[in-house]
Amino acid sequence: MPKSKNAAALVTPRKRGRPLKTDDDSRRSDLVEKSARLFREKGYEKTTVRDIAAAAGMQAGSWFYYFKTKQEILAAIMEQGMARSLQDLEAIASQSLPPREAFRQLVQVHLHTLLAPEHDFISVLLYEWRSLDQQSRSTIIALKDRYEAIWDQVIQALHQSGDWAAPTRFDRLFMFGALNWTAQWFKAGSGTSIDALAEQAVQFILRTPQGKPD
């Protein structure tokens, strides 16, 4: 039976040219991840647009459809990394956990974000912050402030439970300095898992003796 004119009018052929939105999102995400790996391994300044295109399997100028500049990619890497980590921390904060357990989970998330093989975002944030332009920094700083506020709340809860001395404004900075430096020396496959490392970090920071339940 032949189709009516009205039925035929409802069938609109897809236009050629720009990919579907879902394709766009997937391609953009892949481009961000590949760029994050390059920036972590080679550094932002030494990574060229050709390097990025090659890693993403694109022609040299194709990635300009997704980002106008290399600076935009850097900003996207940092924003995506902070947003992912913040989401994990907010999930922990939404639970009514004892302070020590909440702290343990925060440390685990932080170290996994830093050290897991597929997580290059935060390392780029730590070591390429000066490469980011001032306009892009404000967005990242807002996410960073929310991230740090959750840590401050848990530290305050630890203080109230008697597990942390009166907090100072430097406590979190000292702690982050120690945790973030693990990116310089921790090697995957060295015989210690990230979770085991997190347990050691919690014991050290809270001064929990080995073998004593916390």
Placement of each model-derived feature along the sequence:
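N-terminal intrinsically disordered/low-complexity leader segments
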Residues: 1-26, 96, 213-214
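Hydrophobic alpha-helical segments that form the core
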Residues: 4-6, 165-184, 196-208
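Helix-turn-helix
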Residues: 30, 34, 38-72, 76
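Short coil/turn segments at alpha/beta junctions that flank glycine-rich nucleotide-binding fingerprints
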Residues: 41-45, 95-96, 117, 161
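Hydrophobic alpha-helical connector segments
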Residues: 76, 90-120
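Amphipathic alpha-helical packing segments from all-alpha helical-bundle domains
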Residues: 83-87, 124, 134-160, 169-173, ...
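Amphipathic alpha-helical segments used for helix-helix packing
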Residues: 115-135, 184
